[in-house]
Amino acid sequence: MKTFHVIVLTSIFAVAGCSGDKVNLSDLKPAASKSVGKLTIVLLNKSGELMQGQNEFVVQFKDDQGQPADVGDVQIGSSMSMPSMAPMSGDSELTPTGQAGIYKVTSNFAMSGAWHFTLSWNGPYGQGHTTFNSNVR
């Protein structure tokens, strides 16, 4: 299990349908999706929305055929801009599930509002990164 400092991705999605490390994706709704090269990255949780407070969510990587993509080592970070202040930052815990291309994240959003988070990876699909901008309710 790896812990990554996040520039505040603290609490994204409440994941239902996870038993142990195994994730049942059919119980989850997409909250955000982005294509990067030949990869599609989908963030999933039970409601499909980001909420203030403690949350769990799933990050899924898929190849250009829609199949699970093992991208190797994945890191996550998040931040929330604060007027006249330094951005909020915090920690998130990212855990591989043992299922190709599927990772669980436990995080806590301290406040509602506009959050920015980054995912980076290094492995069979090379090195890459992307940024998601999400509204936490």
Where are these regions (language model features)?
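Bacterial N-terminal signal peptides that target proteins for export
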Residues: 1-7
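C-terminal motif of bacterial Sec signal peptides marking the signal peptidase cleavage site
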Residues: 14-17
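Contiguous segments within soluble domain cores/interaction surfaces
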Residues: 19-112, 116, 120-137
